[in-house]
UniProtKB/Swiss-Prot annotation:
It catalyses: alpha-D-galactose 1-phosphate + UDP-alpha-D-glucose = alpha-D-glucose 1-phosphate + UDP-alpha-D-galactose. Its EC number is 2.7.7.12. Keywords: Carbohydrate metabolism, Galactose metabolism, Iron, Metal-binding, Nucleotidyltransferase, Transferase, Zinc. This is Galactose-1-phosphate uridylyltransferase. Disulfide bonds: none annotated. CDD domains: GalT. InterPro entries: GalP_UDPtransf1, GalP_UDPtransf1_His-AS, GalP_Utransf_C, GalP_Utransf_N, HIT-like_sf. The gene is GAL7. Belongs to the galactose-1-phosphate uridylyltransferase type 1 family. Pathway: Carbohydrate metabolism; galactose metabolism.
Amino acid sequence: MSFDLTDHSHARYNPLTDSWILVSPHRAKRPWLGQQEKPGRNDAPDHDDKCYLCPGTTRATGEQNPDYESTYVFTNGYPAVKLEQPDPELTVSNCDALKERLFKLKGVKGNCYVICFSPKHNLSFPQMAQSEIMNVVKTWTNLFQTLEKEALEENKPYKYLQIFENKGTAMGCSNLHPHGQAWCLDSIPSEPAKEFDHFEKYEHQHGAHLLEDYVNLELREKERIVCENDSFLVVVPYWAVWPFETMVLSKRRIPSLNQFTDKEREDLASIIRNLTIRYDNLFETSFPYSMGLHQASLNATEGELKAAWFHMHFYPPLLRSATVRKFLVGFELLGQPQRDLTAEQAADRLKALSGEVHYLAKLEQEESKT
């Protein structure tokens, strides 16, 4: 008997985080009697007077939204980090060296923003036009440039802008209205910091950027590519943890949104739409995920720019159907991450789907014929 990647347990290395993932493809055959999520039906109206993100409504802070017609950004009234707060009083004491060694603390300052993708309450990326997603990409870019300028000219404590979206109740999203968030901190958060560290080490050892080599390898092998265009490709990473996890990778070395050409902005909007349509079509549901952008820090140094390579991570939880999700528990919390479906199997399923026609649009077309 020879080793079979589609049936035998093995571990795969993630060079971005210097970690390993256990792959157990034979477990995909096991029956499931556990928790099931509610199917993602979207019967919401275009506008909801009770939604604090819809145009013209009043937010919990008492501020009223304008009658916006495209994207809309506002400062989060309940931010995770704040600009105005005192620095912690850190005392140095030789008599308690153990406490100082183990109980480390530092203050964190910054600002948090909410980004409404559309004035329509019941839309998400896969049902938006490419031009509407393009407006979101431009908004991300404008926010990056604005905060970079404020840090430089007004000495605001802005170092890294983490843009992300939690879509669906399965990912903890409490509001259906299409929106994302942007948290700007005075330091680089742990996940991108780990990536930067490994990018620098890889280039020092091999003379090339890790993601440059990875993009070229995936383009050569093709088996994990879901879709691509002139500027970007979408892959299920070789080391993926979540069942249908993907990365959106720029084909050239672009440090951040700030360095995009107009064509690259168009291509990013196009590939986000293509990927998210495939996600919804997979189980014919509004597919939940957490998504985020990884890019250069604000006002990056020459070394920081060299280490950066723009990419996006999509982490969707659904595993077998619209109602069965993956949980990171037990061995995965105490040992290491584990997955059942191989990255290649997941990519095959996603690439077989349409990235142009949403399942609801197809359903409407079929119903109109009857």
